[in-house]
Amino acid sequence: MSQSSSLKRKQQPTISSFFGKTTSSSGESTNKKASLNGLGRAKQRIREEESNLSPSPEDKGEYLDDEDEDIVPPSRKRVKSSRISTDGANAAAKGNDDDLSQSPHRNVPASSRTERFRFQSSPVSSLDAEGSQVEGREAIDTERERKRKENLHQKFVRRLGGPGCLPSLEHGSNANTAMTEGGEDEDEALDEEDVAPPPSTKARGARKAASTKLTPLEKQVIDIKNKHKDAILVVEVGYKFRFFGEDARIAAKELSIVCIPGKLRFDEHPSEAHLNRFASASIPVHRLHVHVKRLVRAGHKVGVVRQLETAALKAAGDNRNAPFERKLTHLYTKGTYIDDTEELEGLNAVGANSAAPATGYLLCMTESNAKGWGNDEKVQVGILAVQPATGNIIHDSFEDGFMRTEIETRLLHIAPCEFLLIGDVSRATDKLVQHLSGSKMNVFGDKVRVERVSKSKTAAAESHSHVSSFYAGRMKATSTTQDERARDLLDKVLNLPEDVTICLSAMIKHLKEYNLENVFDLTKYFQPFSARSHMLLNGNTLINLEIYQNQTEQTSKGSLFWTLDRTKTRFGQRLLRKWVGRPLLDKQELEDRVAAVTELKDSDATPRVGRLKTLLSKVKTDLEKNLLRIYYGKCTRPELLTVLQTLQLIATEFSHVKSPADAGFDSPVINEAISQLPVVLDDVVSYLNKINLHSAKADDKFSFFQESEETDEITEQKLGIGSVEHDLEEYRNTAAEILCKKKVCYVTNAGIEYLIEVENSSLQMKKIPASWRKISGTKKVSRFHPPEVVNLMRERDQHKEALAAACDKAFLGLLADISTKYQPFRDCIQALATLDCFMSLAAVAAQPGYVRPTYADEARISVRGGRHPMVEQLLLDTYVPNDTELGTDGTRALLVTGPNMGGKSSYVRQVALISIMGQIGSYVPAESATLGMLDAVYTRMGAFDNMLAGESTFMVELSETSDILKQATPRSLVILDELGRGTSTHDGVAIAQAVLDYMVRDIRSLTLFITHYQHLSNLARTFPNGELRNVHMKFTESGKDGQDITFLYEVGEGVAHRSYGLNVARLANIPSSVLDVAYTKSAELEEKIKRKNLEGIAKGLSRVLENGENEGELMERLLSEVEQL
């Protein structure tokens, strides 16, 4: 009876197990703890334990002191329990106990535990003595029991009576499992549990301090975070990816996921000492790239931390009880995220209503040798822009003035998604970068990430040495047949300007962090920005003419690029964007491009053009980006299959073309492009023959290669797996003999394989060996794993993990082999992109009202019936065409006047856009057009200030005008809109007249000058050969005093002497009371000016009559004044 009672007590929870912060060794006890989370439940539990621990007559001797309770055997992980000292009464009682324990004649009560340790030679007392001893023992036990209960009560008061007792209970029951890793083995979970804190020495009721001991997982996260403090870490933990600390808060905000509160800082700051775990958030494994893309799109730098060990290999290793080894495997930013076939903006990013397309360029910039100050400041700037997704590299070195117009022009052309600034840049440059990248509504259409790196005083020498060693290492890895090309490559790179070399070195180091430094091997695509083979469109021109995005919504709809974009492929679209921003200057090249567009337009219904259209429509993947992902070794198996099959489709379509003459077109440009397509056919077919198409499509790495192409390592591991599976099949016979059955079959349940199923009611249940482990069961059957099967399954899993590693290694080898063919593959894709652009321009040319332009050698714009290309497509009504005639031999400038909202700005933009379209190689919206080779288009339109630089609207206006006067040439087109309006009338007229005269007389560039100063029309009289003509936008007056006007939007000869600003005020719904006053004041001022002019005319006439000298010149001036009246 005593033994059974003792065993029963061993199964009961002890007081110390409740108050001590212990770790449960089973899920059942953990759940029981978690359920008791209130004061009432805690008290109930104490009462239950008191009743359960009441001593029986046989077992009273077991209850010595509370310090000696040891009824429940310890769990796998011992946790120190708090030892709370008692007050004076308890101390005295304990002293009595000690005295009793030191008594030489103390008799220990018998129990199941102490019975066998009693000395057999103990003297036998008489019955009387024995009876008195029993009574004494009972008295002592009664007193001890009373003290024990009092001690228990004191513990209860100390534990629960203080402030915050309920949170303490809840925390104590749940904190131990807060940071264990889901999906990992039990050993690691136990290792990562918190350890109970040491007992507090504070007064009763003091709040218990949180544990500061870090789990192994937390230590791993902190170590990696310290190396990458600027990145948001996504940590693989079992079957989830988790965020910790501040990263979890940011991820929860950006991804709209739940963040469990906790510590945000990684430096163990005292302000978070009351928290014992990190804040955390989690996402499923299969949604990793979805959420990473969202974080990257928001401008964050994201690091992915993966487990480097698998469960099978870890279980077989020596560190099976250690946490999983983790390492940062990938870093992503907006410019370096190429691990997905879709772009960050999505497949339909460049739709009608989308933002302007991002180019994906990373731009590195350095600045040096600042000279002068104020308006005379000059800086030397070097830039290098890399597009990791395509391999394109742009570099330039130039000097810029205080307005930083050169930097702005390059930034607007390149449209980077990420900046890397080297060293300290000037204040003006820094503010320009902030202005262009600081918000989601900037000119790039999205927020831009900016990173900064330091620059030493010996940066030039260090950069040259670094770049030399980088390319020297590349040259050693090349074959002997490529040595000459490699040397040319190195010479080309080392001859770059010094500041560009500094940028190149910094960019190599930057991209090495993302494993993308191999992009610099592709130096064929190093291109200088400022090559004079293209028309220059500066930053103001790109914005004012809406080349890439409109000025209203900052989207691509309504831009010139949107108008011309009819491409079918993403790589064709990128090439067209480059064409739009860099119109040609070579007349012969331009003629070839337009001839190709004409042939495709005229042959639209022919089979050969239809074949091209069909081919382009079948290309659904971005081959240019996919090819570079192959080059980086980041391509997936299904993606590789798609690339190879698409290239095979392209090459097979024109496999009959052996030379450009076989293509069948008249245009040499088209024939040359088509002849590049079948070149890759043999290589593509050879690679396709190496892989299993069905396995590649299903992303099955184990059977990806054909059997004849598998490596020895793959074959060895497959044989090992086959051997183990054979042994598993053989064990079925052994199992059948054990169970005395004819046949045993394995079953799979809940994903667990090789289970042996036995009916519960059968005789075989009695024959199951004790070593067989029961895995699962139902009322009818039980399922077991014999130890032999478990060992074989473990061996099979190890072979599978080794096989997976061998398959990945072989796949990377295949990607490296394909990378050696990068150049011909890239040429094939580039040729298809060129054909896509030609087809797009042919689709534009096929629209009604578009005509092929004629090109002239001199600077000339002769357009009849021209229309605005974008406004025409957006308007529901018919666009009113206009004529333009400008040339170096005739009229070089037009002074455009007219009422507000009369169409002046639309007209001058129309002229510039037709010129740009013509030099892109496109048809233009006109009845006829003869265009010269313009080297640049400059614009000064709109009014805005630069508060950050302390520059007023008028200052910005004149600064931009100054840059135009310095850069314009006789082959440039210059558009100036209302120059001088930002100051007084007299100063504005003087400045406008001086600038216009300088443009026409000295620079002799083609000029369109918009003004409301009617006095400027007199300047045309100073050019007797008609170099400057006055034109105006026509309108008709109606209503009382001509207050109602109708815009005709036609260009006519002469000057408009009124601007009709009050009519615009009425259209803007200015209150009628204000308009009435404005009309009165306008009439008064107009009458006053007329009287003043009449007085001047009268005095002039009197001088003529009196003197009679210079009569012709004076009379001409008087007639002009009369005409203005």
Swiss-Prot record:
UniProt subcellular location: Nucleus
GO molecular function, one term: ATP binding
Region (Disordered): 1-212
Ranges for region Mispair-binding domain: 208-335
Biased composition (Low complexity): 16-33
Protein's GO biological process: mismatch repair; mitotic recombination
Pfam families, per database record: MutS_I (PF01624), MutS_III (PF05192), MutS_V (PF00488)
Record protein name field: DNA mismatch repair protein MSH3
Origin organism lineage: Eukaryota, Fungi, Dikarya, Ascomycota, Pezizomycotina
